[in-house]
């Protein structure tokens, strides 16, 4: 099964309620920061098929689109024609799901269901890890989560987890995918950066795109950092 690099990056954090006066973090990428404490990131759990997290990638969703196209492709009735599944725009998938003919919409719906089961399985395995077992909420970002198709896939995975009596809450980050990582960078930057500057040039390298922008620092306790 051809998986691509994960487009969904899940980082578990714990919000700090107090910060020692005059605390200065001197290491970029430090775990202990004024607003948050980074507990776990980049889980490299593997099995015989490779990295488990790759099954929750945008590439995995495209794989399921292709799988659901095969029955119609075999009889020459693929509604997507010769278009590669990996190159179908998210907006086109959203439009087909909402207003497309029944078979085209059914392909998208089938891929959503298949991907949701895969995502729920990945999250269950992650939540068994020591660093994840106490997670109260998992927040999804990235371009896939910003589409209606992505929202439904994540929402369906959340329902599947609830059916397994898993209490960890599943949310989608409220900021636009192009802005979310840049906003978060200000909370992960070392404090010395803001001793003489009001903002930083943040860079977000995702699974598909690279984004850069000016990010101002604000206390995590004064903003709605989650939905």
Where are these regions (language model features)?
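ATP-binding/phosphotransfer module of carbohydrate and carboxylate kinases, centering on a glycine-rich
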Residues: 2-227
């Amino acid at each position: 099964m051809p998986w691509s690099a994960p487009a969904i990056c899940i980082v578990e954090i714990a919000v700090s309620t107090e910060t020692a006066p005059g605390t200065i973090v001197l290491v970029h990428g430090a775990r202990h920061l004024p607003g948050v404490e980074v507990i776990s990131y980049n889980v490299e759990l593997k099995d015989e098929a490779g990295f488990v997290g790759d099954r929750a990638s945008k590439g995995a969703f495209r794989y399921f689109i292709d799988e659901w196209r095969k029955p119609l492709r075999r009889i020459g009735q693929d509604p997507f024609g010769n278009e590669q599944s990996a190159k179908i725009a998210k907006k086109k998938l959203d439009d087909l799901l909402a207003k497309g003919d029944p078979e085209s919409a059914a392909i998208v719906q089938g891929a959503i269901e298949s991907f949701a089961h895969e995502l729920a399985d990945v999250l269950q395995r992650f939540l068994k890890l020591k660093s994840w077992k106490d997670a109260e909420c998992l927040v999804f970002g990235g371009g896939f989560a910003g589409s209606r198709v992505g929202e439904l896939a994540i929402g369906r995975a959340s329902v599947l987890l609830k059916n397994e009596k898993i209490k960890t809450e599943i949310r989608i980050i409220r900021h636009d995918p192009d802005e979310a990582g840049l906003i978060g960078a200000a909370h992960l930057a070392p404090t010395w950066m803001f001793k003489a500057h009001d903002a930083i040039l943040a860079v977000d390298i995702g699974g598909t795109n690279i984004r850069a922008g000016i990010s101002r620092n604000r206390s995590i306790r004064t903003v709605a950092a989650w939905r």
